[in-house]
């Protein structure tokens, strides 16, 4: 059944491109992942013929004999292609497992989403949009989506595995980070978000729970609408993460990529202090403090970090420090110990 299901381009709606990352341009698909095994995961669908919704691939033979031969050699993934390991986390729409692709022995995080839950919440189009956004992104500090497939009941996302898990869990253990670690994270974030913004992608939800750690401790931005590891239930409201909301969103004004600048300012404060800057006993008080930018620093926060945070947490989005200047900030330059992972060298 899984093979037959995968003959269709997308389990919802009238999407006309074929399943997997075949929805992306060849230029994007040919960007080299970290390993040959990762490249194989990304390119699994490259030689398939295009099928319209409801068409079986076998019925679409107008692409020529070369493409047809390639299709026979590169079948869509099914769950049988993977060995499933321990659970990495649970989310509203499904679970995440450590997994290994049998042929290549390549380790991944396999996100399994239940169609029934997605349909119940009416978020089919959001899921499709978020998959396409993350699939286009290739940066050493962004968790990579290698591919996806589906069967009758589930949708599977094949994701890069981040061995050291959530940044949030490490922050819980240590309560605060030192200047070196915080500055390193700020440099990694500014670089990754600069890349995103150039591609017209706004994350909107930068927070410790959505930041993962690679083998060398390098930052990996995750959750472009869908968590990869176990999501936390803290700081949730129906309009997003309360403590990280910028003034323009609270006030119902139009927002743009400048919201990410506000978020990394809040994050920098939380990493240094142990709690968000506008955290209050009630939602209404938190809203009030955000709108007024009621920012107070404990004496433990060094002056350089205070300067950076103050320049990011501006009520007027256009007055916030640009990402290029975040990476070049004297405090970041003096303290960052950023080490690029092998895939970036």
Curated annotation (Swiss-Prot):
GO terms for molecular function: ATP binding; histone H3S28 kinase activity; kinase binding; protein serine kinase activity; protein serine/threonine kinase activity. ATP binds at residues 88-96, 111. This is Aurora kinase B. Belongs to the protein kinase superfamily. Ser/Thr protein kinase family. Aurora subfamily. It comes from the Eukaryota. Residues 1-25, 50-77 are annotated as: Disordered. The modification N6-acetyllysine is found at residue 220. Component of the chromosomal passenger complex (CPC) composed of at least BIRC5/survivin, CDCA8/borealin, INCENP, AURKB or AURKC; predominantly independent AURKB- and AURKC-containing complexes exist. Associates with RACGAP1 during M phase. Interacts with SPDYC; this interaction may be required for proper localization of active, Thr-237-phosphorylated AURKB form during prometaphase and metaphase. Interacts with p53/TP53. Interacts (via the middle kinase domain) with NOC2L (via the N- and C-terminus domains). Interacts with CDCA1. Interacts with EVI5. Interacts with JTB. Interacts with NDC80. It is an enzyme of class 2 (transferase). Expressed in testis, intestine and spleen. All of them are tissues that contain a large number of proliferating cells. Expressed during S phase, in a cell-cycle-dependent fashion. The gene is Aurkb. Its EC number is 2.7.11.1.
